Amino acid sequence: MTSRTDETANATALGYEQARDELIEVVRRLEAGGTTLEESLALWERGEELAKVCRTWLEGARKRLDAALAEEENAGDDSE
């Protein structure tokens, strides 16, 4: 059995697509029902970790896009 810290570390090592796909599977399992309360709580906790990973990836992508757009605007201003 893995510790909670190990699971969190594993989640943060995932790429966006991997985390998103696993999150989709977690949601599917929760919506399907048929799990014990303990299993449901574990799935919910994993889902929260995965959602955080996805959010971090998306925020990083947004920052990179904003930086690239700002750089492009600055380059355009310098050429005038």
Curated annotation (Swiss-Prot):
Belongs to the XseB family. It catalyses: Exonucleolytic cleavage in either 5'- to 3'- or 3'- to 5'-direction to yield nucleoside 5'-phosphates. Keywords: Cytoplasm, Exonuclease, Hydrolase, Nuclease. Its main location: cytoplasm. HAMAP family: Exonuc_7_S. NCBIfam families: PRK00977.1-3 (NF002139), xseB (TIGR01280). It comes from the Bacteria. PANTHER family: EXODEOXYRIBONUCLEASE 7 SMALL SUBUNIT. GO terms for biological process: DNA catabolic process. Bidirectionally degrades single-stranded DNA into large acid-insoluble oligonucleotides, which are then degraded further into small acid-soluble oligonucleotides. This is Exodeoxyribonuclease 7 small subunit. Pfam families: Exonuc_VII_S. It is found in: Cytoplasm. The keyword GTP-binding does not apply. InterPro entries: Exonuc_VII_S, Exonuc_VII_ssu_sf. It comes from Streptomyces avermitilis (strain ATCC 31267 / DSM 46492 / JCM 5070 / NBRC 14893 / NCIMB 12804 / NRRL 8165 / MA-4680). Its EC number is 3.1.11.6. Heterooligomer composed of large and small subunits.
